[in-house]
């Protein structure tokens, strides 16, 4: 699981990524960081993967913390991966890169993405729109836009374009 609000330990970046798999080889840690689009900023740190971060990730941006958390989740290689607004603090280019990496994961994975940004959801096989804890809409991005329901209104608000044009 990777969450929007990330908890990092007072440890090295490598130690934070490998928390659930401390005996994991460095190359696998780095591969997970690359998939989470974290490798470039980690290597730019004073000690790279050996840089110590303070508890709760003091000194890192929100997006950097989220990418370390995502790398940690990817390193575990779970069959079910839950991403709770994991890319809320990253730019669109980074989010697109991460989504591509998630699509190309080796093996069979089920990924649940909890998000408010349509860009995080639009390529999902199924999208569930919740309203007061109940499923209000269900379908693909295209189907939900055609329904002209809440999802379509959120799309129009986020993209500043009518849902029928944004497909």
Regions found by a protein language model. Name each.
Residues 35, 44-48, 100, 122-167:
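C-terminal portion of ABC ATPase nucleotide-binding domains
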Residues 91-101:
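Conserved D-loop/post-Walker B switch-helix segment of ABC ATPase nucleotide-binding domains
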Residues 14-55, 99, 108:
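ABC ATPase nucleotide-binding domain helical subdomain, centered on the C-loop/LSGGQ "ABC signature"
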Residues 75-79, 108:
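A short, proline-enriched helix->beta-strand linker immediately N-terminal to the Walker B motif
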Residues 70-71, 115:
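Short alpha-helix in the ABC ATPase nucleotide-binding domain helical subdomain
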Residues 2, 9, 39-68, 86, ...:
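ABC-fold ATPase nucleotide-binding domain signature/coupling loops
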Residues 104-115, 121:
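Conserved catalytic loops of ABC-family nucleotide-binding domains
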Residues 81-84:
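Catalytic Walker B motif of ABC-type/P-loop ATPase nucleotide-binding domains
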């Amino acid at each position: 699981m990777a969450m929007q609000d990330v908890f990092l330990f007072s440890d090295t970046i490598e130690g934070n990524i490998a928390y659930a798999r401390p005996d994991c080889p460095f190359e696998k840690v780095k591969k997970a960081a690359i998939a989470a689009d974290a490798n470039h900023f980690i290597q730019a740190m004073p000690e790279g993967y050996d840089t110590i971060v303070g508890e709760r990730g003091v000194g890192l941006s929100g997006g950097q913390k989220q990418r370390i958390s995502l790398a940690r989740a990817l390193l575990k290689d779970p069959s079910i991966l839950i991403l709770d607004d994991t890319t809320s603090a990253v730019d669109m280019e980074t989010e697109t890169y991460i989504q591509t990496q998630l699509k190309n994961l080796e093996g069979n994975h089920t990924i649940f993405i909890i998000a408010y940004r349509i860009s995080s959801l639009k390529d999902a096989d199924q999208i569930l729109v919740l309203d007061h804890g109940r499923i209000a809409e269900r379908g693909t991005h295209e189907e939900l836009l055609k329904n002209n329901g809440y999802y379509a209104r959120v799309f129009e608000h986020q993209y500043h374009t009518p849902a029928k044009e944004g497909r």
